[in-house]
Amino acid sequence: MTAYEHITTGTGEECGVFGAYDMDGRDVAASIYYGLFALQHRGQESCGIAVTDTFGQRKVLSRKGLGLVNEVFDEEELAKLKGNLGVGHVRYSTAGGTRVENAQPLVINYVKGTLAIAHNGNLVNAVELRHELEYTGAIFQTTIDSEVIAYHIARERLNTKTAEEAVKNAMKKIRGAYALVVSSPRKMIGARDPFGLKPLCIGKRENTYFLASESCAIAAVDAEFVRDVQPGEIVTITKDGIASDMSMALPEEQHARCIFEYIYFARTDSTIDGVNVYHARILAGKALAESYPVDADLVVGVPDSGLVAAKGYSERSGIPYGMAFHKNSYVGRTFIKPKQSDRESSVKIKIGRASCRERV
């Protein structure tokens, strides 16, 4: 394996990102914690929070670790994270390896200040860009393509007036599926890839703005869902409100949502690009019943992701819906384990077969 192959093994990163900016100066670490807790299904390998105080010295404080959100953070740790602007991340990797150095958010200190970046997605040209950066003197501390994005944003910031311009220029160089939440002094920036493959949405609670991978995380902090960030859109949140830049957007016919968000990754109580995930799975089950009718006594879903689709299949086919599998609730999501061997062993202890005499 070369120095570059390890960042492209597998399909990339299906993570969860969350950002919060309280214009009145209240600490946001607890809100980010609850937002990440609501996004835990998107990543169980590591997590992190980085915050800054926009009214003070603007020093970035961060805490990252391997494990679930409630394993890495407790009240004492959250109390140390003083700041009214911050970003958070939960990670599931199929690339880059399980090590704390690969946990996000990434905090970059450079001549213009400090950036904290949380990234969900995968770059198809990560190896090429990383190679170019290393040959110009860049030294990488991680094996994830998120650091490639961070380097490009930091370098572009040297030649731009604003951080959002730097994000836009970086987007012109990177290719792939991504959603970004970036904090810089006194502003929070969200960006979505031009195809709209990875979700990102905006929420608001009183004078606090939020960015999140899914709307369920907005609801978890008692905020109001404002809207989705559009494919190719860059949103900049400051004390003056939300500014939008659509110059990277593609025509709507070129948008390409990730179907796996609706099938597996997203929570059923989330709505992505105007489509409720629960409803999408019901419709998928009905479509399957129309395309592939069967002679059976019972329709059974494999918990948890297959349960709603099975209900849709039952409704359309007229075959009763029932349970034939027992799920061990103490085992996490199995598909997002980093290794195939881990997934196989986890499935064995996660799913038990109930006694069932019907044809399923």
Residue ranges with predicted function:
Residues 1-231, 236-296, 302:
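Conserved short alpha-helical segments that host acidic/polar catalytic motifs at enzyme active sites
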Residues 138, 159-160, 293-297, 315-324, ...:
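Secondary-structure transition/capping motifs at alpha-helix termini
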Residues 148-161, 311-333:
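Amphipathic alpha-helical
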Residues 192-193, 309-312:
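A short acidic (Asp/Glu
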Residues 300-309:
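Glycine-rich phosphate-binding loops at beta-strand->alpha-helix junctions
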Residues 318-359:
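Short, glycine/charge-rich flexible loops or terminal/linker lids adjacent to PRPP-binding catalytic cores
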